[in-house]
């Protein structure tokens, strides 16, 4: 094994040799470099015939022994620069998530961003979509080879729904294996920034906010154009406060309460100071899933759900990135693999006007969960309803949380004018922005809003926020008419004072924009959420397309399902959905496994 001293010496020799003009063929990948410096043993357990598991546990341990862990590397990074080791990602991020041994290393950050990191032995990010039924002959061979492992419950996906299901199933006494195809856990949940909608909660009561679960039901149905499954919506709202309590009991901070588009009342819960909710919730769930002994496997793609002759689920076929195909026998399977917003070919199939749009999602949101469920005969609904989030930053490659608007920001076009109610539903906001010149707009806010929402600091760090000491100076920064922007802000401040938006009937007017400096950032719609998916009941059981009855042993939760959000999801309802239905799916699956 390398010591850190030996590792540094080896790199120094490599660099000095190159600088001295020594005839030297530089290694192209990490395996070549380590092979020269210490042989395969420097990474692998040589007597085990290669890798020991798809998490590359041993290999990552070797990396840490030489280079230090992620916290050490983050601490050593320059404080004034974006560092790949200072991340919003959750879980125990492995070195091999980015640094590959036998192929070009690729910064996972580049799946969303364009930081241009100078990565050793690096290559360009690209992701090819491979159908789950590709290489069918090899899959059939693995199935014929028989069962490799047995468990009570298999969970597909490590986002909020999958992690909530894992915690819930473990608490119900089930043995759980959670499978994640990506090298990074957390799914879309780790990217969610706004909040978690819940009604009649303790944080609301403490802040004097009066809300009712029925109002949340009504808002959700109205936002979804009333095509939601009303029974699923009732479960969402009626269990929402309990889900807040459940998260809080495990260490989550959900004490800050704001408002998202389409809500009649402040009910969007998030950490103190308005920090991003998703990464926080995902980390809490991850920590608790690990604490409970959940077997979590990354780089592990489920390519088939297995059933017996009667149609009962019997397990899954997995393709490990390094270990290959193998079968896990399970009494129950929970699909929590998310939606397909990152698969534009599929998105544009259902909604052609979204062809070529960017997406706010993580790279794994390609629709695998739907594919394996369809193979198993599952029913689907509402697949044509796909949401574009109105505030995506083209410059930063990130979604700008709806909470910026909720806390008082306005949206202006290139003429410096407001053109909509900023906290309308996402579908209406996106449509309004696409009608403006350049099909984009600007969020404008002041320093009081910046100080009210910690999430904004991340956007500042990405250098996508423009700043001016005055509104007129800010207008020059974003190239809009200064007089018009000043007029717009003055008019809006008057609406705040009077308590009524005479232009666009914005229902919530939190604050005037008067505290310098002033800020703006460009926004445009991007594909964000796929409302349609698998048909489930209130127990999270997946229904059969053929019979309309539950498929025995198959459950689902989160964005992979349809019916909760109807034609349009309200901001803040996704986290509520994944936590509440993740809990239900995990408990239902565990109970079924125990009873059968």
Curated annotation (Swiss-Prot):
Binding locations of heme c 3: 85, 95, 98-99, 118, 385
Superkingdom of origin organism: Bacteria
Compartments, as annotated in UniProt: Periplasm
EC class: oxidoreductase
UniProt entry keywords in alphabetical sequence: Electron transport, FAD, Flavoprotein, Heme, Iron, Metal-binding, Oxidoreductase, Periplasm, Signal, Transport
Signal peptide: 1-25
InterPro entries named among the record's database cross-references: FAD-dep_OxRdtase_2_FAD-bd, FAD-oxidoreductase_2, FAD/NAD-bd_sf, Flavocytochrome_c, Multihaem_cyt_sf, Succ_DH/fumarate_Rdtase_cat_sf, Tetrahaem_cytochrome
Active site: 426
Cofactor: FAD; heme c
E.C. number(s) listed in UniProt: 1.3.2.4
Single annotated GO MF: metal ion binding
Gene name as annotated: fccA
Segments for region (Flavoprotein-like): 142-596
This protein's name: Fumarate reductase (cytochrome)
Taxonomy of the source species: Bacteria, Pseudomonadati, Pseudomonadota, Gammaproteobacteria, Alteromonadales
Ligand binding (heme c 4): 88, 109, 112-113
Binding site for fumarate: 194, 401-402, 528, 569, 572
Induction notes from the record: Induced under anaerobic conditions in the presence of fumarate.
Binding positions for heme c 1 per the UniProt entry: 40, 43-44, 101-102
The keyword Metal-binding is annotated on this UniProt entry: yes
List of residues binding FAD: 161, 180, 188-189, 193-195, 302, 368, 529, 559, 574-575
Subunit structure: Monomer.
Protein family membership: In the C-terminal section; belongs to the FAD-dependent oxidoreductase 2 family. FRD/SDH subfamily.
Residues that, per the record, bind heme c 2: 34, 63, 66-67, 225
Role summary: Flavocytochrome that catalyzes the reduction of fumarate to succinate. Is essential for fumarate respiration during anaerobic growth, acting as the terminal reductase. Receives electrons from the membrane-bound tetraheme c-type cytochrome CymA. Under ferric iron-reducing conditions, can be part of an electron transport chain to ferric iron, by accepting electrons from CymA and transfering them to the c-type cytochrome MtrA. Also plays an important role in the reduction of selenite to elemental selenium. May act as a transient electron storage protein.
């Amino acid at each position: 094994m390398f010591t850190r001293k030996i590792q540094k010496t080896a790199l120094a020799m490599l660099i000095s040799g190159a600088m001295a003009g020594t005839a030297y063929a530089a290694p192209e990948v990490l395996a070549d470099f380590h092979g020269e410096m210490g042989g395969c043993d420097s990474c692998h357990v040589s007597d085990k015939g290669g890798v020991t598991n798809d998490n590359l546990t041993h290999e990552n341990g070797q990396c840490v022994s030489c280079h230090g862990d992620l916290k050490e590397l983050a601490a050593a990074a320059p404080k004034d620069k974006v560092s790949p080791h200072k991340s919003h990602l959750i879980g125990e991020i492995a070195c091999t998530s980015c640094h590959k041994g036998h192929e070009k290393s690729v910064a996972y950050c580049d799946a969303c961003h364009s930081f241009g990191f100078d990565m050793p032995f690096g290559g360009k990010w690209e992701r090819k979509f491979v159908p789950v039924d590709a290489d069918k002959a090899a899959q059939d061979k693995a199935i014929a080879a028989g069962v490799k492992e047995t468990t009570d419950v298999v969970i597909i996906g490590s986002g909020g729904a999958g992690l909530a299901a894992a915690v819930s199933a473990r608490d119900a006494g089930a043995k759980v294996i959670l499978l994640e195809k990506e090298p990074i856990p957390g799914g879309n949940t780790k990217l969610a920034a706004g909040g978690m909608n819940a009604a009649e909660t303790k944080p609301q009561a403490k802040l004097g906010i009066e809300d009712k679960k029925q109002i949340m039901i009504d808002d959700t149905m109205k936002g979804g154009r009333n095509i939601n499954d009303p029974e699923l919506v009732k479960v969402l709202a009626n269990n929402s406060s309990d889900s807040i309590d459940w998260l809080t009991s495990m260490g989550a901070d959900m004490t800050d309460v704001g408002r998202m588009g389409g809500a009649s009342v402040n009910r969007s819960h998030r950490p103190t100071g308005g920090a991003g909710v998703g990464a926080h919730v995902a980390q809490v769930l991850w920590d608790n899933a690990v604490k409970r002994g959940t077997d979590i496997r990354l780089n592990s793609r489920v390519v088939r759900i297995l059933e017996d002759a009667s149609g009962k689920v019997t397990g899954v076929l997995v393709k490990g990135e390094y270990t290959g195909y193998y079968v896990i026998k399970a009494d129950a399977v929970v699909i929590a693999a998310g939606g397909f917003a990152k698969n534009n070919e599929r998105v544009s199939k259902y909604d052609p006007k979204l062809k070529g749009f960017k997406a706010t999602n993580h790279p794994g949101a390609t629709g695998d969960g739907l594919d394996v469920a369809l193979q198993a005969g599952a029913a689907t609904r509402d697949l044509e309803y796909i949401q574009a989030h109105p505030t995506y930053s083209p410059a930063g490659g990130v979604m700008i949380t709806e909470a910026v608007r909720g806390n008082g920001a306005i949206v202006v076009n290139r003429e410096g004018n407001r053109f909509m109610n900023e906290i309308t539903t996402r579908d209406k906001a996106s449509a309004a922005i696409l009608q403006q010149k350049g099909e984009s707009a600007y969020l404008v806010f002041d320093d009081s809003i910046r100080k009210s929402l910690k999430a904004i600091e991340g956007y500042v760090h990405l250098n996508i926020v423009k700043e001016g000491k005055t509104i007129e100076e800010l207008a020059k920064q974003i190239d809009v008419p200064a007089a018009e922007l000043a007029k717009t802000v003055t008019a809006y401040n008057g609406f705040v004072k009077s308590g009524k938006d005479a232009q666009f009937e914005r229902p919530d007017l939190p604050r005037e924009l008067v505290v310098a400096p002033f800020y703006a950032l460009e926004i445009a719609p991007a594909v964000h959420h796929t409302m349609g998916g698998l048909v489930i009941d209130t127990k999270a059981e997946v229904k059969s397309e053929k019979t309309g009855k539950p498929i025995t042993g198959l459950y689902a939760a989160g964005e992979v399902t349809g019916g909760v959000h109807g034609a349009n999801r309200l901001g803040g309802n996704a986290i509520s959905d994944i936590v509440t239905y993740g809990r239900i799916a995990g408990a239902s699956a565990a109970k079924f496994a125990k009873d059968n």
